[in-house]
Amino acid sequence: MKKTKIFLCIVWVLVFAGTGSIAWAADAVAGYQTASQQENMDAASEGDNGTGDGLDDDLFDAFEDDASGKSRVADPIYYFNYAMYTINDRLYFYALKPLASGYKAIVPAPARRGVRNFFHNLLFPVRFVNNLLQGKLHQASDEIGIFIVNTTAGVAGFNQVAQKHLNLQTNTEDLGQTLGTYHITEGFYLFLPFFGPSTLRDTLGRAGDYFITPLNYVEPWELEWGLGILDTVNRTSFRIGDYEDLKSASLDPYTAIKNAYIQNRRSQVKR
């Protein structure tokens, strides 16, 4: 049992430390697409006839926006942030990417989509509460309907019946966005160990969302961590290449990630 705990701790560190560098590119961007858009992006990533090249073109527009100073956020702990970025970057390429690539080669795309849908369904409380806090009552109501339909007819959320057959769409919101709608400023930039780019406001939001995320209450903790690793590896398997594309498009990847993250979060707050 002790060896199992040590092994899980090592895997957790290797996997989650690598996710931070790509989280904004994979989930914070693609994760906010509609179900039909997401299917197209998945098809493209699987080599099918889907549309899109992985990263949203709007994301690269963030680099141009920064030239006018629109996305400037203070970075007073630059050396710490850059060190965390470097660590996450290395662990992505040497741990998470190989693991996700092997997983992708073994597990068929339909099964991986089912796993992704399952974890997305689990985040219903976060979406519902934050839609409610933002006064988006219609979207909050839709979240309830989607959760009930997908949990029952969709078999624990593995199938997105509500999105495909009832034309209902989730409206992904988190506490960081909610704080933004209340005009709470972003604060300074942070590159968090394991979680990647953030701001002081988003970090506080992440801490608040922790308490309404069902996965954090799974017992025993080994199962919780195991599910977290599965979720991370599975999500990454759909987005291999996104982070690489961003890095290759910029002479300064650290700044590019910072600017793109900030612009993306601002657009999410405004929508």
Where are these regions (language model features)?
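Bacterial N-terminal signal peptides
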Residues: 9-19
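Bacterial N-terminal signal peptides that target proteins for export
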Residues: 2-10
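N-terminal targeting leaders of membrane proteins
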Residues: 25-134, 227-271
